[in-house]
Curated annotation (Swiss-Prot):
CDD domains in the cross-refs: PurM-like2
Alphabetical list of Gene3D superfamilies matching this protein: PurM-like C-terminal domain (3.90.650.10), PurM-like, N-terminal domain (3.30.1330.10)
Pfam families, sorted: AIRS, AIRS_C
GO biological process: thiamine biosynthetic process
Protein's name in the database: Uncharacterized protein MJ1416
Protein family membership: Belongs to the HypE family.
GO MF: thiamine-phosphate kinase activity
Organism: Methanocaldococcus jannaschii (strain ATCC 43067 / DSM 2661 / JAL-1 / JCM 10045 / NBRC 100440) (Methanococcus jannaschii)
């Protein structure tokens, strides 16, 4: 394992010449990634170097608040030296400090993180229990507050689009051996900012090192989970979309993906646009007003952008979603849209974090009032989604990868590999082997159970 971004960042801070960084990084890529050629390796390391240089420019901006947001508090103590994850005195101390951040939110749980128990508890009545977990955006490792903030929103969105009210959050954070402990606190503070804003407690989690003693560097790898409940009514799952429904969307300002684009292209002021909990508030309004019961399906525009979500809904619900391009573009925050268009990034292929609501037409006006959504399309018979642009009706299909939204992603590209079908067959076989192993162990457990 090698953290290329961390390597380049450290080299720049040590004033190592750029040609030396490229030369050494190029060799390391070829050494570790056996399936790439020299041309790709050189382009790749150059793109990483340019990205890191761009993000480092935030230290020169005049906006002190934004600068503080992007920096994390440095303790000068690494994960390894403090013994984090080693289940001793240093580890216990760090966990008590994490609990102190959680306590500062004043969002109550029945058994909270500050009690240092093995699990947290909240009280809830439920007809259905809904759970989701989201991984932190990989490129926000050096911006842990933003990473924690946006992954928490992502997990909560996944709960709310099912028609559930969130009742608890959990977190999992791994920081490599040389990472400053302050990164963990900054990440947790990002989670807790959302927790406090929407009144959902962070009740537990796990804190370890990436690879223990075996991985050096300061890479942060993390996730946040959310638990929600549906007290009455039915889930608003994608499969429930019906012919004749209308499609509404709220304004989306993006989350981790848009933040990453802003950071790695130097559009730092766009980051402010992403700092909101509008999506969650809109969903809470739907639940508390009772209008959630009138909605057939909801989703967040994230997975491969509108292209990906529309495609998946069509396949799952076996209906055709028809979108008006001009109206869809009105649901993208103007500053975010400007950035995407200037950088030649397809706005329909990235996560904009709009709330998409599919409902009967007779309830649309009431739903618009409590969410701020606008009507962008409708559902008809068929199994493919389309974008209407003037007289043109364009199929909405996802690319092999989402729109390339950083310089490195533009090097990697969006095109499907030529041997993709062969790759799928190999992946299927690996999955089959995993199922066989699971079945073997289940039988083993059944045999052992008979001894009692």
């Amino acid at each position: 394992m090698m953290d290329l971004e961390g390597y380049v960042r450290r080299c720049l801070r040590k004033k190592i010449p750029e040609n030396k960084i490229i030369e050494d990084g190029f060799k390391r890529i070829l050494e570790i990634k056996e399936d790439v050629d020299e041309e790709f390796a050189k382009k790749f390391i150059k793109a990483i170097l340019e990205e890191v240089k761009t993000t480092e420019k935030f230290r020169e901006i005049d906006d002190e608040n934004l600068k503080t947001l992007l920096k994390y508090p440095k303790s000068g103590v690494t994960m390894g030296r403090m013994g984090v994850g080693s289940r001793g005195e240093g580890d216990f101390f760090v966990h008590r400090e994490i609990a102190r951040i959680v306590k500062s939110t004043k969002v109550k749980a029945y058994v909270s993180a500050e009690e240092q128990d093995d699990a947290g508890i909240v009280r809830a009545d439920a007809k259905y229990i809904v759970a989701a977990i989201d991984g932190t955006h990989s490129r926000l490792s050096d911006f842990p507050f933003l990473g924690g903030f946006h992954v928490t929103r992502a997990a909560l969105r996944d709960i709310y689009v099912m028609g559930a009210e969130a009742v608890a959050l959990i977190s999992d954070v791994h920081l490599a051996d040389d990472g400053d402990v302050g990164k963990i606190f900054d990440f947790t503070a990002g989670i807790c900012a959302v927790s406090e804003a929407v009144n959902v407690p962070l009740i537990g989690g796990s804190t370890l090192r990436v690879g223990g003693d075996m991985v050096i560097g300061d890479r942060l790898v993390s996730a946040v989970g959310a638990i929600g409940v549906i007290k009455e009514g039915e889930p608003t799952a994608r499969r429930n979309a019906e012919v004749g429904d209308v499609i509404l969307m709220t304004e989306g300002s993006g989350g981790g993906t848009i933040t990453t684009t802003a950071l790695y292209y130097g559009w730092f002021d766009v980051i402010y646009e992403t700092l909101n909990v509008d999506f969650i508030k809109a969903c809470q309004n739907l639940i508390r007003s009772g209008l959630i019961k009138k909605i057939h399906a909801m989703t967040d525009v994230t997975n491969g952008g509108l292209r990906g979500d529309a495609y998946e809904i069509s396949k799952t619900a076996k209906v055709s979603l028809i979108f008006d391009k001009e109206k869809v573009y009105k649901t993208i925050n103007p500053k975010v849209l400007e950035m995407l268009e200037v950088l030649n990034i397809d706005p329909l292929g990235v996560s904009t974090d709009s709330l998409m609501i599919i409902c009967p037409e007779e309830y649309a006006d009431d739903i618009k009032k409590v969410t701020g959504a606008i009507e962008v399309g409708y559902v008809e018979e068929g199994e493919e989604s389309y974008l209407v642009d003037g007289n043109k009706k364009i199929p909405l299909k996802p690319m092999f990868r989402e729109s390339a939204y950083t310089p490195v992603k533009k090097v990697v590209g969006e095109r499907k590999p030529g041997d993709f079908e062969e790759m799928k067959e190999k992946v299927r076989r690996a999955c089959d082997e995993a199922i066989k192993k699971k079945d073997f162990v289940v039988e083993l457990l059944k045999e052992r159970k008979k001894k009692f």
